[in-house]
Amino acid sequence: VQWCTCILTLTSPEKKQYHVTAAFPSACGKTNLAMMLPKLPGWKLQTVGDDIAWLKPGEDGRLYAINPENGFFGVAPGTSNDSNPNELKSCKKGTIFPNVVLTPDGDIWWEDMGIDAPAEGIDWKGNPCYRCIDDRKRMGPKPGMTKAEIKESKYVAAHKNSRFTAPAVNCPVLDKAGFNGKFNGKATGVPIDAILFGGRRPSTIPLVNQAKDWAHGVFMGSAAGSEVTAAVISDQIGQVRRDPMAMLPFFGYNVCDYFQHWLEMERTSADATKLPKIYFVNWFRKGDDGRFMWPGFGDNSRVLKWICDRIEGKVKAQDTPIGYLPFAKDISLENNTGKDTVNPKFLKEIVKVDKAGWLKEIEGVEANYAEYEKKPSKDSKEELAHAPRIPRALKAKLAEIQAALAAAK
């Protein structure tokens, strides 16, 4: 399987290694996660890849992954020493920066970089731009503009989807063996312990949700949706767009066949009990005030620890209609310090099931499935016979979850 996902190596304080893949739509944090500096003491994260994985079943039943790329392709705006120091260090040399600000001395700058803007520069359109007079970390299209004026104009000096393309060897936390496709000295790729799907969802979707079985995990991936960001060329910014397995722009063949291929992995595995556990994560829940309820970035290591604890059978979970959710007490709050911290009150909210929201979510998935199954324009027997069909196992999971939600108190 070729798949748009990052690959990371996570090492616990007990020196136990886990390999995790995470498939998110563009601008939802794949690169940030792949190079994260864990907030939890004693945990170490290394990067295998930030964008693509090739997956292959092993003779032992495990799923192995390699990174076929030789570098990183990250979103520039928002990348800073606070959000992801390892990502910024990866850009120190040999890096291409399209559509960012060019400074008079030949350097680069972008919004939320965490450093002062230059007094003047050339913006992503090739036009002059100037430092804001009351916020040294903002730039406007005219000299002497205030922060309020720039905000009202919706001007950005660096394009919201401006990027950096850096060689992988620059990464200070590169897992060199994993990057070279080796595990225990053999060129097998790294064995995957957990698969994460995710998206940018301001409501309904909990912080982390574990699939109850392989088919349920494939359903999670098939149902994935995300708030549209500037990384997508669209006039629907802010609306939820279905993006199954974070592969919508990249499917090389019919999406229904792709789902079936994932389902077949369980049947064809040499030992299906060794397949990775599947989870759905959401770092982007918002409160009624529109602010994020989870700090993200290095604090996402708290969720990864819970996932590892589940793999090891160390913690129990809430058995809900939508999957296994964590008890808030099992999300570690060790070293919960700094500028952005986990709010325990918010944490309790984002590990609950929003019944009404989920019933609407299931309706949305059902409607999206129907789109994939649209009949051909001509009703010939041959075309009808080859019309795409959502696998029965996924429809059964949808019906099962819908019924369980309806019956829940």
Model-predicted regions and their roles:
Residues 11-16, 38-47, 58-60, 269-274, ...:
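Secondary-structure transition/capping motifs at alpha-helix termini
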